[in-house]
Amino acid sequence: MYKVMCVFGTRPEAIKLAPVIKELQRHADSLKSVVVVTAQHRQMLDSVLNVFAIKPDYDMNIMATGQGLSDITCKVLKNIESIYETERPDLVLVQGDTTTVFAASLAAYYKHIPVGHVEAGLRSHDKYHPFPEEINRRLTSVIADIHFAPTDKAKDNLFREGVDKDSICVTGNTVIDALLDVAALDFKFDDNLLNNITGKLVLITAHRRESFGKPFISICKAIVTLAKLYPDVTFVYPVHLNPNVRNTVYPMLGDVSNIILIEPLEYVPFIHLMKRAYIILTDSGGIQEEAPSLNKPVLILRKVTERPEAVKAGGAKLVGTNTHTIIEETTHLLEDTKEYNRMASIANPFGDGHAAQRIVNFIKHKLVKNEQKITVRLNTREKSPIAV
C-alpha cells in the first residue's frame, strides 16, 4: 500500500484535484489517499469541498486578513512539517501555481519526500505576469519528481528546461474532468435575477494581482463603456472578495443598470453561468481552459498567458487591460456573427475528461509497479529541520 498526499489551499486547486482524489479513492486496494488543505482561501475553498464531498484529513486553516505572500509561505512551511512526519507519504501531490503549491513542495523536498506536480509546465516566460504564479510553478518544477503536463506545449516547456522525459506524463487538464460532470447537471440559480436574464450575457471575472491599480481601472472603464453602448446586453460580474478588486469595481460599475454585480459564486452555479454566457471576459487561467468545452469565446484580460493553446486554436484572444482594445474586441464579437461562431466552435485543446485516470495510472506505474523508481525512497529520508 502506497500513500499519496494531496495538498492544496485554494478553490481552483480543489476543483482540479477533486477528480484526482476521487480516482485515487477508486484505487484504494493499492493507494491510500490523504488530503491536506492549507485553506489559503477559506470561504471559496470550502464551497468546492462540499460540492465534491471531500473531507480533508488535515486542515491547516492559515487564512488571515491582510496576510502577504511571505506570511503564507512561512505558515505552510512551518505547519506542514509535522503532517509530513506523522503521515510519511510516498508521494506529495500538488496542483498548479499557488503559494501553497510552492511551499508544500519545498517542505516535502526538505523531508526527502517525492513530489508530483499536476498541471506542470505552464509558462508565460514573464516572471511578473502572472505574479507570483509564474515563479511558483517554475520553482515547483525544479523540486518535482513527477510532472503531469496538461498539454504537449507544457511538456515541451519542461523538456527545454532539462526535465527528464521519463518523469513527464501528458494527461490533459483535470479541470475538464470536473467541468463535464458538473455541466451535465440540471440546474436553476437561487437568484431569480440570473434566471430571468434575456438576451446576450457577457460574463466578467478579473482579480489578478498584477492588474491592481491602473490596469484594473482601465478594465472597469471598458465595461462601463460597453454597457452604455449595448443597453440590451447584460454584463454579469461575480466580484472577487479581495478588497483591491471590490474597492475599484463597486464605485465604478455599481450604478450602471445593465451591469449586475454579484458575490463570488460557488463552483456549480458559476459553471452554469458560463453556460448561459455569450462571451467571457476574464483573467482567470481556469476559465481559459473550461470555456472551449462550453463553446464560449474568451477575451483574456492579461498581457500574457501561460495557456497559449486556446489562443493558438482560435477560441481565445489576448486583449490585455487597455480600455480601447477591450471595447474593440468585445464589440467585434457582439456584432460579427461569423467571427463569433468561428471562436465558439474550436475543439478544447486542454483535455477530454480523462486526465485524472491518466494521472493515477502513472502514479501506480511509478510507485506500485516500480518500473521507474523514484530516486528518493522512504528508507533514505532524512529528518532535517525546516529553515525559513
Question: Model-found features: residue ranges?
Answer:
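Nucleotide-activated sugar donor-binding and catalytic core shared by glycosyltransferases
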Residues: 1-237, 243-388
